[in-house]
């Protein structure tokens, strides 16, 4: 065979193989840049410390000195936030408002995990009794390090993860999310999560299903067993694999008219235990759960699910419609891992059952919120969530609503944003804590 014929033969062979591969691997979800696995290398890295004829050198580093790992940002979180931070309200992939809004203005992203900008929002107030109190930004969630976006952990409440040993100084986006995601769901029942085997063909966050030949990535690229960032030295590898959950494709949105339902399936609290191991309490035992609410697969809603479904707001437990009852302010885990079932559940508003369970994200947001400990609402003892039908705020027309213990240094608009845009009419005129969604009794109201 002459060289020209050989070249033609090789080209034809490559085209045939390419067509076969395309026919084997299903089309990827168009809105999923990471596609469940590793994205395009040059989105995060630069080969020669430059891009578009501009150097990547930042933050007064000597010209020619590159960022670690040839990243486009000064560090791991900065590189993530290059794409995931922005000022456009409810921009689908944004999880941090940037620039951070000034005092009196609110972060604009409304993803289920919350807006990291709250880590830079400090609230101060004086109570009706004259006591000065505050809620510093560092208390509002997971304190990531990002030099380019001014997120630092030196003011964090904890030097290590509460209930664990993970060092706060090493906290970044990739502490939880594997940027080169190796973790893949191998079957439609999500019974097997592996790091090798079938190639990842799409995201595992939106309901794509594995096939006989391909897998899908883990939920939100979360790391699994033995995962830790390459930059972290020490014995900090994860024990548990990623949770199984499915999000709707439209999730960064106001919930003023309807809830955004992430169908949490299985393993969320057990995964959180990778860093917060001693906080794990998955059985209801007063001697071991004092100060820590039970959560995890065994913390079933058996005794409270009827209250959850009947509850509309404080004092109103009249819902009897079995297709209603769900609230994304108090989500639950379903205790299942079937991907198709979970995908269908993202469109439902039905409430809980006896086999569902409490999880960490029932009360907390994964990233950050307007409240201490990244809770979904103001959980301070004795705090009303509405006063005389209005949200509390420093600008409230109601004197009690102005009081610091209720307003917590926020305007009424800021407060409403922290409730994901819900109008106060969704709640009772004097709304107690949303602990009542499960525990509608005086003992648990405050």
Q: PLM features: residue spans?
A:
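Generic start-of-chain signal for non-secretory N-termini
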Residues: 2-4, 29-32
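Sec-dependent N-terminal signal peptides
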Residues: 12-20
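Helix-centric, low-specificity signal for extended rod-like, repetitive segments
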Residues: 3-5, 21, 41
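C-terminal segment of classical bacterial N-terminal signal peptides
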Residues: 21-30
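A motif-centric signal for short, conserved binding hotspots located
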Residues: 31-446
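N-terminal secretory signal peptides that target proteins for export/translocation
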Residues: 1-11
């Amino acid at each position: 065979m002459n060289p020209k014929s050989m070249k033609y033969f090789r080209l034809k062979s490559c085209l045939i193989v390419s067509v076969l591969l395309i026919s084997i691997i299903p089309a990827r979800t168009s809105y999923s840049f990471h596609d469940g696995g590793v994205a395009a290398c040059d989105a995060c890295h630069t080969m020669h410390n430059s891009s578009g004829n501009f150097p990547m050198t930042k933050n007064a580093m000597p010209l020619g000195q590159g960022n670690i790992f040839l990243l486009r940002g000064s560090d791991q979180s900065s590189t993530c936030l290059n794409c995931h931070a922005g000022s456009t309200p409810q921009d689908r992939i944004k999880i941090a408002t940037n620039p951070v809004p000034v005092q009196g203005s609110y972060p604009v992203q409304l993803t289920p995990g919350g807006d990291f900008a709250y880590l830079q929002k400090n609230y101060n107030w004086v109570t009706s009794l004259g006591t000065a109190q505050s809620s510093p930004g560092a208390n509002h969630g997971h304190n990531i390090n990002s030099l380019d976006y001014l997120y630092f952990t030196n003011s964090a409440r904890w030097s290590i993860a509460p209930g664990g040993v993970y060092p706060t100084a090493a906290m970044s986006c990739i502490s939880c999310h594997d940027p080169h995601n190796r973790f893949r769901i191998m079957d439609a029942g999500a019974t097997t999560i592996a790091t090798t085997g079938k190639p990842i063909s799409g995201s595992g966050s939106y309901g794509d299903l594995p096939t006989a030949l391909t897998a899908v990535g883990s939920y939100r690229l979360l790391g699994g067993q033995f995962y830790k960032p390459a930059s972290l030295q020490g014995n900090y590898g994860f024990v548990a694999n990623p949770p199984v959950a499915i999000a709707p494709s439209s999730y960064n949105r106001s919930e003023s008219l309807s809830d955004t339902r992430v169908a949490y399936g299985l393993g969320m609290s057990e995964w959180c235990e990778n860093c917060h191991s001693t906080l794990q309490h998955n059985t209801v035992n007063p001697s071991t759960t004092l100060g820590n609410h039970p959560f995890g697969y065994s913390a079933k809603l058996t005794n409270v699910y009827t209250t959850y479904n009947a509850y509309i707001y404080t004092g109103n437990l009249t819902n009897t419609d079995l297709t209603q009852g769900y609230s994304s302010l108090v989500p639950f885990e379903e205790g299942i891992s079937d991907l198709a079932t979970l995908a269908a559940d993202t469109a439902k508003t039905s409430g809980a059952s006896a086999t569902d369970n409490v999880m960490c994200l029932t009360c907390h947001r994964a990233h950050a919120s307007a409240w201490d400990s990244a809770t979904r609402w103001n959980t301070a003892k004795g705090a009303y969530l509405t006063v005389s039908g209005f949200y509390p705020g420093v600008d409230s027309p109601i004197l009690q609503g102005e009081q610091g213990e209720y307003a917590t240094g926020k305007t009424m608009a800021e407060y409403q944003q922290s409730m994901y845009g819900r109008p106060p009419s969704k709640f009772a005129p004097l709304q107690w804590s949303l602990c009542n969604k499960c525990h509608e009794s005086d003992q648990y109201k405050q």
